[in-house]
């Protein structure tokens, strides 16, 4: 990826939405994060590793910088926007009970699936339906995200 440019971008998006938190906001796209999502840890950033007990721990350093800053950059968007009334619409409807993906790749005999594409919306925007449309035709390496909502 683009290393720290990604984190600087996520930090900038977070600050911009913080300034505009009283507006109706929609933020959607490919964020290339998180690394994992599960019932125990919720969101797991790329700066975290899962220990022997299954708990996510932030690495001291990551990709030539502080792991804490990287984790905060990813976490600020994926779960932190809730502080401004902007939520991940997929998780709002399904919590962490439902696993899905928008991107996948094969590594040897292992298929890795990640939910990199997101739709975030202000609380006043009611999401009625949201789903990833998986298609074998591979127009893109990501699955489109269909979202229906009302204001």
Regions found by a protein language model. Give the residues of each.
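Active-site regions of metal-assisted phosphoester/phosphodiester hydrolases
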Residues: 1-151
């Amino acid at each position: 990826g683009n290393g720290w440019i990604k984190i600087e971008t996520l930090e900038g998006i977070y600050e911009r939405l913080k300034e505009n938190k009283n507006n109706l906001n929609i933020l959607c796209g490919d964020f290339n994060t998180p690394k994992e999502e599960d019932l125990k840890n919720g969101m797991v950033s790329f700066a975290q590793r899962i220990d022997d007990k299954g708990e996510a721990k932030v690495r001291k350093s990551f990709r030539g910088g502080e792991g804490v800053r990287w984790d905060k950059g990813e976490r600020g968007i994926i779960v932190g926007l809730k502080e401004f009334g902007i939520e991940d619409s997929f998780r709002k409807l399904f919590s962490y009970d439902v696993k899905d993906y928008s991107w996948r790749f094969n590594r040897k005999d292992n298929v890795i699936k990640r939910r990199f594409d997101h739709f975030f919306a202000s609380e006043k925007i009611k999401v009625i339906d949201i789903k990833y449309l998986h298609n074998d035709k591979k127009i893109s390496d990501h699955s489109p995200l269909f979202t229906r909502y009302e204001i």
